[in-house]
Amino acid sequence: MKKTLATLTAGGLLVATLAASHQGATGIVRDRMDGMVAMRDTVRDLTPMMRGRTEYAREAVLDAAAALERHAGETMTALFPEGSDDAASYARAEIWQDWETFEAMAMRMEVVAGALAEAADNPPGSAMPEPVDNSTMMGGGPSMMGGGTATEPDPEMLAQMPVDRVFTVAAQVCSACHTQFRAARN
């Protein structure tokens, strides 16, 4: 539970400064920042429900999953063409130096967002139908969110999990991508 809360908090902190980063951003840099803010807001709005602080609302989870999925995958990667690392951007050069890993993370977010929608029928903290083997579900733990050597998350297995656990995986994907590919700004 503490690890889940720490992950959600860290993920929230990593994206909390995005709004301030819009100063001077134009064109595609501004477009991708707007997409990241939409994802940040989605995670922020769903966090109290996933922590049990507000009543569970399946429709809110479905809306959030759709928003995450809409900004992930190819939609996300299209917003990072080479040469779009101007001064207003928080994108690190590593995105273009290790495009395969960045692209894999964007695709993982899309998979996990789809699984979040599927898991919406599994309220937070509900029992899973059978034991979950994390090595097949998420490529061996942290590696799922990181490098390109991980196996892809199993969307069917994720969809069987309690929705709060799938939400945590989504937050971990965001956090891992930001850790590797987003520059820190003061």
What residues fall within each predicted segment?
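Bacterial N-terminal signal peptides that target proteins for export
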Residues: 1-9
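Sequence context surrounding c-type heme c attachment/ligation sites in exported
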Residues: 22-53, 58, 62, 66, ...
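Extracytoplasmic entry segments of secretory-pathway proteins
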Residues: 2, 16-26
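Bacterial N-terminal signal peptides
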Residues: 8-16
